[in-house]
Amino acid sequence: MKKRLTLFSLLLLFTMTAMAQIEVYGIYYNLNRSNNTAEVTTYKYGTRYSGDIVIPASIWVYGVDYSVTSIGYRAFCDCSGLTSIEIPNSVTSIGDYAFYSCYRLTSIEIPTSVTEIGESAFSTCSSLTSIEIPNSVTSIGYAAFAGCSSLTSIEIPNSVTAIGESAFCWCSGLTSIKIPNSVTTIGNAAFCDCSGLTSIEIPNSVTWIGNAAFGSCSGLTSIEIPNSVTSIGYTAFASCSGLTSIEIPNSVTSIGDYAFSRCSGLTSITMQRTTPPTVGDDLFYECSKLETIYVPVGASEAYNVAPWNEYNIVEGEVAGIESVTLEEWPADVYDLNGRMVKAQAENLDGLPKGVYIVNGKKFVK
């Protein structure tokens, strides 16, 4: 009986050892003995990684070679002393919160073997200035780079089909970003509160712009919505105070609540659709400068409903004042009722804001 208990104890000890955390040269791993792979993990007793870390492609444990294929959940989370890290080409996935709040990390190179970047993987890495996402990555997880306030630019590869919810939220240092034509959806709050963002190029592969996708991007001065987009989400462009005008393509059939609310600089909206899209509540809430809605020829009656009819509805394409060339001056200026308001004018100075006709063309002041 005593021998049986001893044998059972040895087997139990072996099983516990097999499941135990392994440390090799200062890095901790979980081993998968069924396929000889290893996952980098955090040390369960609270010790934090620091300095410059080089993760090997494989480790040798008790005579067995283990390939390092993943960086696990919270592996380097809150490692405030971590300054640099080298990830081998054997790694295919970066887990949720893997580098969360590593605020001294300034740069990182993701190898081409990685296909998945987990939720909040690099969130609040506030010193991270640049990062290159390889074209092996197909999706960017929830809040993957949220709060990376020093990040100035990022290139999204054309392997990515979806930009996850809050993926780049609070990246206040971002000034511009190009989205590849492989992307079909821009997730909720994907670029929310990127106050430094001045321009963004959305490809015609995108069909859906999520809730608050560009909310509070106060530096955004222009954006072109492609004719592939069918839905604009709740508060999608809310509080984009730098926007002065926006064109909504014919493809858009629905616009969510407060989509353009508090766009304090917005003066005009151009609609390409002959019938109004379905819209939510308070679409233009607190857009105090919004005066004019431009609609296709013959569409003014269709737009004679709320919220459109709360503004001056003008049919036809309207050129901006910047397109009036010097060769067209001096010219007579007429209001929309055909009354001459300024004879042989050199410009529109001195006239109140509104729409005017110059040489048969409509212009906005």
Feature names for model-found ranges:
Residues 33-36, 49-70, 80-93, 103-116, ...:
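Structural signature of tandem-repeat unit edges
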Residues 315-337:
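Residue-level detector of functionally pivotal "anchor" positions at catalytic/ligand-binding pockets or at interdomain
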Residues 73-75, 95-100, 118-123, 141-146, ...:
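Consensus positions within tandem repeat domains that build extended binding/scaffold surfaces
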